[in-house]
Structure formats: C-alpha cells, structure tokens
Amino acid sequence: MSSFKVAVLLIAVYGASQGTSIPGGWTRQDPTEARFLELAHFATSSQTEGREFYDTVVTVKEVETQVVAGMNYKLTIEISPSVCKIGEVQYSAEQCVPKDAQQKSTCVAVIYHVPWQNQKSVTSYRCE
C-alpha cells in the first residue's frame, strides 16, 4: 500500500476515535455527571398518569446531547417505584427512595432545555 493511502487511513482512524460528531447529531456524554441525574429525576417525577406512587431514578446508564435551539438531552435510565405516594407528598430525589431496588425498568427520556428562556420540558418518555 502506498504511504499516501496509509496516511489517509491513519488520519481517518484517528478522527473516528476522537468522537467527532455530526453537526446537529447526538453526542455521547459522561452519565455520571450530577446534572444528568438531576434531569433524570425531573423527567421521571413528571410521569404520574396512572400511577399511585412516583417512580424514582436508580441509575443513569447513558446520556446523549443534541444542540438545537437549546439542548436536547436523551437519557437512558433505570427506574423503580418509590415509597412516595402521588398526591400525598411532593417528589424529592432524597425522600422518594426505591421501595424495592430489585424491581427496575429501563426508560429513555428526552428533555428539551432552553436555559435563556427558563424552559425545560419532557418531550419523550418510554419504558421497556
């Protein structure tokens, strides 16, 4: 193989390994950052329809972000029913601990956030 082809191949492999993203595409983030746990609790606590108890976040497994006119956050999370009854208490990440940490579901939430307009909303939330 010519040295030119080898150089092009090495540059392509290096670029791919650096996690370069497509403009407007989703970019992986570190799921251990505290801000993502806060967003996960925000999304999960908003899901009350048809439930007697709030669900709570057990762990944030994956996070992807997308720059739009604001920011989209796609969170893959594990949730579990909490000890907090809807209508009796306000959701709190500290107080609404799992009833049974073994009973988990995996969910994907998309949160749209426009900080300069003080706007944050859950645009999608689905569980397996």
UniProtKB/Swiss-Prot annotation:
One of its GO terms (molecular function) is cysteine-type endopeptidase inhibitor activity. Inhibitor of cysteine proteinases with broad specificity for mammalian cathepsins, including endopeptidases (cathepsins L and S) and exopeptidases (cathepsins B, C and H). Also inhibits endogenous cathepsin B-like and cathepsin C-like proteinases. Does not inhibit human legumain. May mimic specific host-derived cystatin(s) to interfere with its/their function in controlling cathepsin-mediated proteolysis. It is found in: Secreted. The keyword Nucleotide-binding does not apply. Widely expressed. Detected in salivary glands (at protein level), gut (at protein level), ovaries, and Malpighian tubules. Belongs to the cystatin family. Residues 1-19 form the signal peptide. The keyword Kinase does not apply. PROSITE patterns: CYSTATIN (PS00287). Residues 29-116 form the Cystatin domain. GO terms for cellular component: cytoplasm; extracellular space; vesicle. Induction: Down-regulated by a blood meal. SMART domains: CY. Disulfide bonds join C84-C96, C107-C127. This is Cystatin-2. Keywords: Disulfide bond, Protease inhibitor, Secreted, Signal, Thiol protease inhibitor.
